[in-house]
Amino acid sequence: SSLFKQVQNWRARVSTADFAVTNGYVYLKQPAAIVDPDLLMRTFEFVAQNGAPLAHATELHVAQVVEELAARPVKFEWWRHLSSILIRPHAALALRIMQQLGMLNVIVPEFHSIDALALRDLYHQYTVDEHTFKAIETVHKLQEAEAEWEVRFREVYEELEEPSLLFLALLMHDVGKGAPADKPHVDASLEIALERLEALGLSARETEDVYWLIEQHLEMSAVLRRDIFDAATVRAFTKRVGTPERLKMLLLLTYADIKAVNKDALTPWKAENLWQLYISAANDLNRSVDDDRFHADTDPELLRNIRLLAPQLGKRLKRFLEGMPQRYLSLHSAEEIAAHVELASKVNGN
């Protein structure tokens, strides 16, 4: 039948040198080969990409390697593989399997403290670990968005430079909820994140962005309880955010965090307010950059850096840059600026 052929074609398309999909389950072509973290993590990447769970036989092989890794931790490029899992469409399925087989605890040992942890209130529908996976799933499901308000969030997601950082922040934003009750969960999550981000092998800038997202993950929700049409409220929020990229990630983190609490948590009214706050903050960030001008006396460092690359420009460089919007300086390299100075000199005939 044509349906049988479609299934056969899908199996052939998704199968690789290492993995085969049979009856909708992932099998290892060479089970004995799964002895190192590399193939182990690629197994979860395969699940995250194709949405097929592991066959029972595969689970047994994986569990054995995970057990050995838990007993004897190894130095490994965990972030390279974890980031690849997080950005794939079925990341949440892969993460659930990783948790079930103990792999998530190998990478983030503190995750075991939120395993099946229930919050005793009427608001949270899911355990903390499942809320985390749902939040990651929520962002990925934006790819299927049809409603106009959801499409706007999807477009922001598609603009992200490094979506893996957003997903890592979501993975770790509530990990501190398993800490003693006398410590605020954000503080506990930050302590854990600081240690884990370094162990995962993130760069200093990546660590800073993920840490900031975890630290501020309740901020947008807090601002929504104020007057979001008040310019001073928006300006104070914008100052804390700092960059358009962080604003985009915080918007999506907040959207996913609220939506993954329970099926009715993100009402259309709340989603609209969240979007309005984002637009106001984005406009404020753009205005701030346009209003901010370069002055040689207050920023001599930049002048020196460009002069090192193009000493022939002399005083023309200072004249050209004086009063330029800071946005221009952030968009162009020193080489491009030097070329623009030369072009302006030709146009002006000097």
PLM region descriptions:
Residues 47-57, 105-106, 143-147, 176-180, ...:
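Short helix-capping/linker segments at secondary-structure and domain boundaries
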Residues 1-122:
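Non-catalytic interface/linker regions that flank or bridge core catalytic/transmembrane domains
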Residues 6-26, 100-120, 127-175, 180:
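Active-site-adjacent "gating/activation" loops or surface patches in catalytic cores
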Residues 1-3, 54-62, 74-79, 93-102, ...:
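Short coil/turn segments at secondary-structure boundaries
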Residues 117-121, 144-159, 194-195, 231-237, ...:
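Flexible, glycine/threonine-enriched loop-and-boundary segments that flank and lead into catalytic domains
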Residues 37-50, 84, 97-100, 137, ...:
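Short, hydrophobic/amphipathic alpha-helical patches that form generic packing surfaces
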Residues 1-25, 233-350:
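Regulatory modules associated with amino-acid/nitrogen control
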Residues 1, 127-128, 154-288:
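Divalent metal-dependent catalytic cores for phosphoryl transfer on phosphate-bearing substrates
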